[in-house]
Regions:
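Conserved active-site-proximal phosphate/metal-binding subdomains
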Residues: 1-3, 7, 11-22, 41-282
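Glycine-rich beta-to-alpha transition loops that act as phosphate-gripper elements at the mouths
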Residues: 23-40
């Protein structure tokens, strides 16, 4: 995140109080280059204001760290970060403005954040405009779906208009290979729910066609459809659609798609926004 205030002015006004309190003082990010960071560490930044040296204890490094050799960021993202021109030290990019390949938007915490001006930033700006206003979201629904489709977290689709097979296939299209074991666990639970819906038994346990962990999701869907042909024609019930949305929230790791377009869409889309920078698929 970034501030609209001058770091130097904040430090000059509060440095004595902070040091008197004995707290560990760190500053950043957005320091720009090693020389600027070093000036805060040795305190020389304060000399220009006619003060004695005012060293800090540490600096925060964000974007440069993502582009470093050691970072798990994929190479395409590193290259994009390096090639984005950025802005001159001491200048600002106003909220919604695009300059130097950068824009200032709002994070899922509704705090100001600098972003590369790409499809993700455009989507973020649109979602910030509609907020949690259900009428505004409904009025711009098609625009939102299109914006989501250009990001790493597209809209899953209208679940109640899908067959059970299509729902399972769409999940695999958007989430496999699993980036986290909980994504695969959700799929296993979804398979179990679908099989329970399609089997003849109306209560109690039933003999499952799956006798162990699902290692090949595409093969599992074929096996399910062969055992229960209705999977190809029966549309998802409202109860199962609600189960699906609840399932996406069940584990800490968010799913790599937006399951439903509602008043919580901004949070659903923005949760865990940096994970895709590690995966070349995105």
């Amino acid at each position: 995140h970034h501030s609209w205030e001058s770091l130097d002015e904040l430090l000059l006004a509060t440095y004595a109080d902070l040091r008197h309190a004995g707290v560990v003082l760190c500053v950043g990010g957005g320091l720009g280059d090693p020389e600027v960071a070093a000036s805060y560490l040795d305190g020389s930044w304060a000399l220009a204001a006619g003060r004695y040296a005012m060293p800090v204890d540490g600096v925060f490094i964000g974007t440069p760290l993502m582009a470093s050799r050691e970072a798990a960021t994929n190479s395409q993202v590193k290259r994009l970060l390096v090639e984005t021109p950025g802005i001159e030290e001491g200048t600002w990019v106003r909220r919604g403005e695009v300059r130097g390949g950068m824009t200032s938007g709002l994070s899922q915490l509704h705090a100001d954040i600098y972003e590369v001006a790409n499809a993700s930033a455009a989507c973020s700006r649109l979602l910030a405009e509609v907020g949690s206003d259900e009428r505004a979201i409904a009025a711009r629904r098609d625009e939102i779906v299109e914006a989501l489709s250009r990001t790493a977290k597209p809209y899953f689709g209208d679940i109640e208009e899908m067959t059970y097979r299509r729902m399972l296939e769409r999940y695999v299209e958007l989430a496999y290979p699993w980036v986290d074991e909980s994504i695969g666990q959700r799929f296993a639970e979804l398979l179990d729910r679908v099989e329970g819906r399609l089997c003849e038994a109306d209560h109690g346990a039933w003999p499952s066609v799956f006798d162990g962990p699902v290692d090949d999701p595409a093969a599992a869907i074929e096996k399910l459809a062969a055992a229960y042909p209705k999977a190809d024609t029966l549309c998802v019930t409202p109860a199962d659609a609600a189960f699906f949305v609840d399932l996406t929230r069940k584990y800490p790791k968010p799913v790599p798609f937006v399951p439903v377009i509602d008043a919580d869409i901004s949070r659903r889309w923005a949760s865990d926004t940096l994970w895709q920078s590690h995966d070349p698929r995105y």
